[in-house]
From Swiss-Prot:
The chain crosses the membrane at residues 623-643. The keyword Transport applies. It comes from Homo sapiens. The modification Phosphothreonine is found at T584, T585, T587. Residues 372-543 form the VASt domain. Keywords: Cell membrane, Endoplasmic reticulum, Lipid transport, Lipid-binding, Membrane, Phosphoprotein, Transmembrane, Transmembrane helix, Transport. The modification Phosphotyrosine is found at Y389. It comes from the Eukaryota. Residues 96-163 form the GRAM domain. This is Protein Aster-B. Residues 41-51, 545-556 have a biased composition (Basic and acidic residues). GO terms for cellular component: endoplasmic reticulum membrane; endoplasmic reticulum-plasma membrane contact site; membrane; plasma membrane.
Length: 738
């Protein structure tokens, strides 16, 4: 498969034709045929579809050739075609349909992406929008009535986002000097607009897409399975780390052929990388090449001399340039150095040191840039780069303690394995605890870490971690990429940069996307802030242990370092001596007043010391207590207000029922005009009179009853008083007689 890709992508291949060559395609961005205007629109019935003919004989020849070449594998492809290919055609089928529908376009135009949408005319014409590198095309077929529209990107004056019926944001308007085209019913309007705007920008700037960038867009829109065959010779596989934000410069055919041949030969002669990482020290055997005066090239495309002397000033660069031009540099080799190999090619200098511990040429530049998302960590630590790698990417006590603090459980570390492309990867499985009320309490995570083969011990490590979180809402829509870049700054200093990117497998709706990104960025910020603080604590502990060493050990280390550097005194370069001088161990004050470098500038800023962890937790607990009290008080207040509102509504309903009886007495706005209306009014008045009379009768009746009860009570009271008077008189009489 590897050889097949090389044979397909090489521009000097015997099978490539001028019409299909991607280089000639870029250089021959010729104007369209003469019978073609800036934008054309054709409407016709399907019975005239057979009249579509190529505008030029050359196009007809190219199509006939392509059809003949595709016949060889046509039967097999039809037999092996799955049922879902009929419902979801591949990119190859889409591109063939695009060429059949728009025969008036040049054959160099290749479909990049197509979208389902509608064109607004007298009615909405539902169809598909096709985007190529220089054209916007639309095709619709409604009840066998076809509509074709082609607009050249260079002729577009403006491109704006619009709303259907001034309410639904799913439309794009494209304006030329003479016409306006309103496309609506897009499923993902913003993504479509960004693609159209990018192609329009490239067309106006006359900077066409290079083949890798074009096929990168195709893979982004249609996935990895494009349905291509060996007949598609213009296919160029994009790199995994291909950046689509830059423009590709046009390369002459001769230069491209030379580059392709040289790259092919270098791939064929490249030895397989060992499972272990390449060492930092470079022996003389790797630097010398018999029969060639070219300097070997490192992983980032720079000569090894420039890479080794990078950051040491202009004088060292001049030495490396003089070495490349073949001028001899006098160097006195140490007598007891067994690594030097004296041969005919003595112009190439050997390594500056025979020990990997004495390299202080400056900060190493990473061979990959940061991800396009966000950068959370960019810090220099007083560890060697290998020490930092052991802390983060091995089953170290630091890693276990950190995962325990993050409340990770069911942790499974799989060993590092070497892949076919030379990279090394491993898988880590664990369970995390979630605090989001909309998510479950725990979720399983699968983290795949990939260390690129260009990583070197004691120099640079670049590791990508792909994190898949299961059991969370919309977990099948997205995944996370974290890029850890570890570079050497000095002998005992290294820089850690961590950048992250959120990638989508399926495009979510706007509200869902906002929910995902909000929780994603907040969770990662907390995680990496915790990681940085734990690394700072480990750094302070490590420095404290280093300070406990005896003075004899420090003196012996200093003398050994100086002895290793003595063989390089014959270079007589003052700046090199300063760079190669012994590195002193930083003190605690250096850690306390660390200076953080801002990426992309030379400015520095002071990082204040972190507060104690206990005080921080206490302040957080107090804050949570205050928030809970406020929430409880608010709930009680809401309950009281609801009760008051209920009471007022009940009183209002009671008052309304009481006043309904008085509605008949209100003066109407107009007097009755007919006899019927007068009769209805008199009838209502009579009913109201009878009702009121009945109420008064009941009131009088109840009053009479109360008066009778009062009368009876008074009579009983009077009788009681009389009986008492009678008994008292009789007793007095008896007393008198006795």
């Amino acid at each position: 498969m590897k050889g097949f890709k090389l044979s397909c992508t090489a521009s000097n291949s015997n099978r490539s034709t001028p019409a299909c060559s991607p280089i000639l395609r870029k250089r021959s961005r010729s104007p369209t045929p003469q019978n073609q205007d800036g934008d054309t629109m054709v409407e016709k019935g399907s019975d005239h579809s057979s009249d579509k003919s190529p505008s030029t004989p050359e196009q007809g020849v190219q199509r006939s050739c392509s059809s003949q070449s595709g016949r060889s594998g046509g039967k097999n492809s039809k037999k092996s075609q799955s049922w879902y290919n009929v419902l979801s055609p591949t990119y190859k089928q889409r591109n063939e349909d695009f060429r059949k529908l728009f025969k008036q376009l040049p054959d160099t135009e290749r479909l990049i992406v197509d979208y389902s949408c509608a064109l607004q005319r007298d009615i909405l014409l539902q169809g598909r929008l096709y985007l190529s590198e220089n054209w916007i095309c639309f095709y619709s077929n409604i009840f066998r009535w076809e509509t074709l529209l082609t607009v050249r990107l260079k002729d577009i004056c403006s491109m704006t986002k619009e709303k259907t019926a001034r309410l639904i944001p799913n439309a794009i308007q494209v304006c030329t000097d003479s016409e306006k085209h309103f496309f609506t019913s897009f499923g993902a309007r913003d993504r479509t607009y960004m693609m159209m705007f990018r192609l329009w920008q490239n067309a106006l700037l006359e900077k066409p897409l290079c083949p890798k960038e074009l096929w990168h867009f195709v893979h982004q829109c249609y996935g990895n399975e494009l349905g291509l065959t060996s007949d598609d010779e213009d296919y160029v596989p994009p790199d995994d780390d291909f950046n689509t934000m830059g423009y590709c410069e046009e390369i002459p055919v001769e230069e491209n052929e030379v580059n392709d041949s040289s790259s092919k030969s270098s791939i064929e002669t490249k030895p397989d990388a060992s499972p272990q990482l390449p060492k930092k020290s470079i022996t003389n055997s790797t630097l010398t090449s018999t029969g060639s005066s070219e300097a070997p090239v490192s992983f980032d495309g720079l000569p090894l001399e420039e890479e080794a002397l990078e950051g040491d000033g202009s004088l060292e660069k001049e030495l490396a340039i003089d070495n490349i031009m073949g001028e001899k540099i006098e160097m006195i080799a140490p007598v007891n150095s067994p690594s030097l190999d004296f041969n005919d090619n003595e112009d190439i200098p050997t390594e500056l040191s025979d020990s990997s511990d004495t390299h202080d040429e400056g900060e190493v530049q990473a061979f990959y840039e940061d991800l396009s998302g966000r950068q959370y960590v960019n810090e220099v630590f007083n560890f060697s780069v290998d020490k930092l790698y052991d802390l983060l990417f091995t089953n170290s006590p630091f890693q276990r303690d950190f995962m325990e603090q993050r409340r990770f459980s069911d942790i499974i570390f799989h060993p590092w394995k070497k892949e076919e492309n030379g990279n090394q990867s491993r898988v880590i499985l664990y369970t995390i605890t979630l605090t989001n009320p909309l998510a479950p309490k725990t979720a399983t995570v699968r983290e795949t870490q990939t260390m690129y083969k260009a990583s070197q011990e004691s120099e640079c490590y670049v590791i990508d971690a792909e994190v898949l979180t299961h059991d969370v809402p919309y977990h099948d829509y997205f995944y996370t990429i974290n890029r850890y870049t570890l570079t050497r700054v000095a002998r005992n200093k290294s820089r850690l940069r961590v950048s992250t990117e959120l990638r989508y497998r399926k495009q979510p709706w706007g509200l869902v996307k906002t929910f995902i990104e909000k929780n994603f960025w907040s969770g990662l910020e907390d995680y990496f802030r915790h990681l940085e603080s734990e690394l700072a604590k480990t750094e302070s502990t490590y420095l404290a242990e280093m300070h406990r060493q005896s003075p004899k050990e420090k003196a012996s280390k200093t003398t050994t370092v100086r002895r290793r550097k003595r063989p390089h005194a014959h270079l007589r370069v003052p700046h090199l001596e300063e760079v190669m001088s012994p590195v002193t161990t930083p003190t605690d004050e250096d850690v306390g007043h660390r200076i953080k470098h801002v990426a992309g500038s030379t400015q520095t800023r002071h990082i204040p010391e972190d507060t104690p962890n206990g005080f921080h937790l206490q302040s957080v607990s107090k804050l949570l207590l205050v928030i809970s009290c406020v929430i409880c008080f608010s709930l009680v207040l809401l309950v009281i207000l609801n009760m008051m509102l209920f009471y007022k509504l009940w009183m209002l309903e009671y008052t309304t029922q009481t006043l309904t009886a008085w509605q008949g007495l209100r003066l109407q706005e107009r007097l009755p005009q007919s006899q019927t209306e007068w009769a209805q009014l008199l009838e209502s008045q009579q009913k109201y009179h009878d009702t009121e009379l009945q109420k008064w009768r009941e009131i009088i009746k109840s009053s009479v009853m109360l008066l009778d009860q009062m009368k009876d009570s008074l009579i009983n009271l009077q009788n009681g008083i009389r009986s008492r008077d009678y008994t008292s008189e009789s007793e007095e009489k008896r007393n008198r007689y006795h």
